[in-house]
Each structure stands twice: as C-alpha cells, then as structure tokens.
Amino acid sequence: MKTILFLITAMTVCYQCYAQNDVPSADIQIKSALLAAPQERRDSCTVYGHAADKQFILLRKGTNELICLADDPNQAGLSVACYYKDLEPFMQRGRELRKQGMNDQQIFDTREKEVKAGSLQMPKQPAALYVYSAEDKDFDRTTGEVKNGYLRYVIYVPYATAASTGLPEKPSAKGMPWIMNPGTYRAHIMINP
C-alpha cells in the first residue's frame, strides 16, 4: 500500500513538473503577452515567445512601437511584459546575460558598464514598460485565461533622480509613483496600483 501511495505521489509531482514546463501554443502565448499592452495598441504589437524546444522566437511581427514578451514556461506563475521599442537593446542584452548564467546584480553591473562605454544604448526620452503578472493557480496555460492579474507600470528615465523629477524614492501610498534606481542608467518611475 505504501509503495502504491508513493508511486501515485511521485507520478503527480512529475506530472506537475512536466505541466509547469509545457510551452503553450503560439496563440495562447500571444493572447497572454498582449495582456501587458495598452488595450488600443494590442492588435499591432510585436510579440516574442517560446518554441516547443523553449527557444526564444518571434511569434508575431507588429507594426507599432511596442514589443511584448510571452511568459517564460520555465518560471512559476505568469509574467508577461510589453515595452517601447527603444528599450529593446537593453532588454535583449539582459536576456543574453541571463542565458550566460548571470544573476540580477551581475546583469545590472555589466549593462551599466556597457551603457557608460557607449556600447549599449538606452532611450534618450522616457520609455514605458508594462508588466502583467498572476499566480500559477490563476493562469490557465491551455486557454490563456487569467484571474486576479496585476498590471504595474514602469517608465525608464535614465539617470533621473528624486531631485530631478520631484518623485520620492519610496511610495508612501498605494499607486503613488516613485523612482527606483535613481541616478543610474536604469532609473525608472514605478507605478504599482
């Protein structure tokens, strides 16, 4: 009896691991990625996602200025993003460094050196990033339906500070804009509704 119970438990765990890493269809990836985009721009965004072998690929070529990223099937929960096209060199470099095995701090430091050296360009004007997320239990990977999703807003303003923007470095109320990484190449305004 113990052996049967163990085998059932092991099979359930293995199934959950397999299901967690299953790559949704291109249609589902596009549908969920577009949840991060402003409603009026969703029809013409470029969308990147993952092939069945989990390689990062172009799923749909768009005609507007926004690039959306589908959820990473290797991560728990749902996290999709959409950003202004001028952020693509910064975002792509982050993906490359992550693929090389770097952690968050190493990626931050490497990109900072590259921005200062002029080999990595940041936008010259403010640039938006939208991130939509949900817990695993609230995302159906077979239909793309999401319950209890959360959308946060980021506006990149390289080298801006609290003094240059009038924004605090920490929010003191829900939904209050604040500046993160002030004074760095990666300074950005956070808005968490």
What residue spans do the PLM features occupy?
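Primary mode marks residue(s) on the alpha4-beta5-alpha5 output face of response regulator receiver
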Residues: N21-P193
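Bacterial Sec-dependent N-terminal signal peptides
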Residues: M1-N21
